[in-house]
Amino acid sequence: MKSTEQHYSIKEAMLFSQRIAQLSKALWKSIEKDWQQWIKPFNLNINEHHILWIAYHFKGASISEIAKFGVMHVSTAFNFSKKLEEKGLLSFSKKQDDKRNTYIELTEKGEEVLMKLMETYDPTRNAVFNGALPLRELYGKFPEILEMMCIVRNIYGDDFMEIFERAFENIKEDFVEQDGKLVKRAPKAEEHEKELASPG
């Protein structure tokens, strides 16, 4: 049986929740501005970019998965996915064994746009990155934000955090840095052919 006894004061609870709220709002304002500037040349808004991002990492996702992992309402996920379909960046489908859910997948054009976006990422134009840079210089690494991740896990659950982590693992595996840009890694067969073709 769960104990209902409080081990914190109301003042402590209010101070913590308001501190998180104010810091999150300040961070979001900066994040939103930088995100919009990054994707603006591609005629996308933040929800559309987020949907493309999730569809890429899922290799096909249901609208409800997009809503859950994009932290948006189902109708928002559907409406922005429809706009992406009209732009030729997504395709809609139903699965033979699941006629109730609508699934989306990146089209070739959608993946091209996402890859170009990755290539145009410029950390010098990102305020949060620049704000964290002195910490990296001091400690040799960026903040891991473990406490924040724990809070998010407790709110949204393990599934959410697994997808969150998978997305970043995919970036580590799928992309390499070339000439100061992130580019998609060549498939293994192509890499092997290049190794065979290179004189050595």
From Swiss-Prot:
InterPro entries: HTH_MarR-typ, HTH_tscrpt_reg_Hpr, MarR/SlyA-like, Tscrpt_reg_MarR-type_CS, WH-like_DNA-bd_sf, WH_DNA-bd_sf. One of its GO terms (biological process) is response to stress. HAMAP family: HTH_type_Hpr. Homodimer. One of its GO terms (molecular function) is DNA binding. This is HTH-type transcriptional regulator Hpr. PANTHER family: DNA-BINDING TRANSCRIPTIONAL REPRESSOR SCOC, TRANSCRIPTIONAL REGULATOR, MARR FAMILY. Negative regulator of protease production and sporulation. Residues 63-86 bind DNA. Residues 13-157 form the HTH marR-type domain. Coiled coil: none annotated. PROSITE patterns: HTH_MARR_1 (PS01117), HTH_MARR_2 (PS50995). Keywords: DNA-binding, Repressor, Sporulation, Transcription, Transcription regulation.
